Swiss-Prot record:
Homotetramer. SUPFAM superfamilies: Chorismate synthase, AroC. This is Chorismate synthase. NADP(+) binds at residues 48, 54.
């Protein structure tokens, strides 16, 4: 009811605020016997961690995760896994001047009206700082999924007006943009440097792909795999749109083009993005998400205060000029959590189902 838990069988509940003591998560439903240690989670957290390049927020959080429960002698026990990350680099004084003002396009106004109180320090619970716990929980899901041959990866496919064609997975983790085309890096660097001089921000597009997904994941009609994946990705801060497969480009396609024809050797295309009728087809699961430009910029903006009076807001603090730069690990985590939950749900109901039809490659 309160919206802090994700999943049905594999559940993740997060807690904590941007400038609070710590962030935490309870991960429940993980099968026992999964080899797990903090370093498995730390790898993905380090990919998301703030302050790692001049193009992201300069808030420097080590994001060292602690596993408090649910793991014994290096393996999961099947009981709830408690995770904790302490906040160490808060600068709450940066927000003292806006405690009675609403930053344009932020959650300040809506949180104030919904709860009657808000933690104005860095956005409190509405801050993307919360996503650190999603990444940690997602790493647990990814560890299990890998044992089943499922791999989740993502990359930046657009930064502002700059389209980025996919070239190679090997390049993605070698640069701060998660860019799959090394030849694009100078253009991205120059664009971000100019953006900082302009004291402005920009949006981005992230693509996430899961390979090795078996046929059959998804629970029609209301818990279709693509519906739950869209829900998961839309829950990420600043995401304003999600596409599965060709998404909105399908509007201009004809049926003769869009249909993914099949032969005994396999599918001839994947316009559907790996989902047919809400159920995984065994093809790569492909999703794209659009992130808006943050309104946390140093240019003055018109707004109101808690009394309804007109004010001019200048946002202080340390912010990402493009929140999409660090969104790839978060999107990967949410896809992994969705797949983990549906894998367990499918196994619970349909583990004994057998068909004579071969699986297409």
């Amino acid at each position: 009811m309160s919206g802090n838990t994700f999943g049905k069988l594999f559940t993740v509940t997060t807690f904590g605020e941007s400038h609070g003591e710590a962030l935490g998560a309870i991960v429940d439903g993980c099968p026992p016997g999964v080899a797990l240690e903090a370093s498995d989670l730390q790898h993905d957290l380090d990919r998301r961690r703030p302050g790692t390049s001049r193009h992201t927020t300069q808030r420097r959080e080590p994001d060292q995760v602690r596993i408090l429960s649910g793991v014994f002698e290096g393996v999961t026990t099947g009981t709830p896994i408690g995770l904790l990350i302490e906040n160490t680099d808060q600068r709450s004084k940066d927000y003292s001047k806006i405690k009675d003002q609403f930053r344009p396009a932020h959650a300040d106004y809506t949180y104030h009206h919904k709860y009657g109180i808000r933690d104005y320090r860095g956005g409190g619970r509405s801050s993307a700082r919360e996503t650190a716990m999603r990444v940690a929980a997602g790493a647990i899901a990814r560890k299990f999924l890998a044992s089943q041959g499922i791999r989740v990866r993502g990359y930046m496919s657009q930064l502002g007006p700059i389209d980025i064609a996919f070239k190679q997975w090997e390049a993605v983790d070698t640069n701060p943009f998660f860019c799959p085309d090394p030849d694009k890096l100078p253009e991205l660097e120059a664009f971000m440097d100019q953006l900082r001089r302009d004291q402005d921000s920009v949006g981005a597009r992230i693509t996430v792909v899961a390979d090795g997904v078996p046929v059959g994941l998804g629970e029609p009609v209301f818990d279709r795999l693509d519906a739950d994946l869209a829900h998961a990705l839309m829950s990420i801060n600043a995401v304003k749109g999600v596409e599965i497969g060709d998404g909105f480009a399908s509007v201009a396609q004809r049926g003769s083009e869009h249909r993914d024809e099949m032969t005994p050797q396999g599918f001839l295309s994947n316009h559907a993005g790996g989902v047919l009728g809400g159920i995984s087809s065994g093809q790569p699961l492909i999703a794209h998400l659009a992130l808006k430009p943050t309104s946390s910029i140093t240019q003055p903006g018109r707004s109101i205060d808690v009394h309804g009076e007109a004010v001019e807001v200048v946002t202080k603090g340390r912010h990402d000029p493009c929140v999409g730069i660090r969104a790839t690990p978060i999107a990967e985590a949410m896809m992994a959590l969705t797949l983990m939950d549906h894998y367990l749900r499918h196994r619970a109901q349909n583990a004994d189902v057998e068909v004579s039809t071969p699986r297409l490659g």
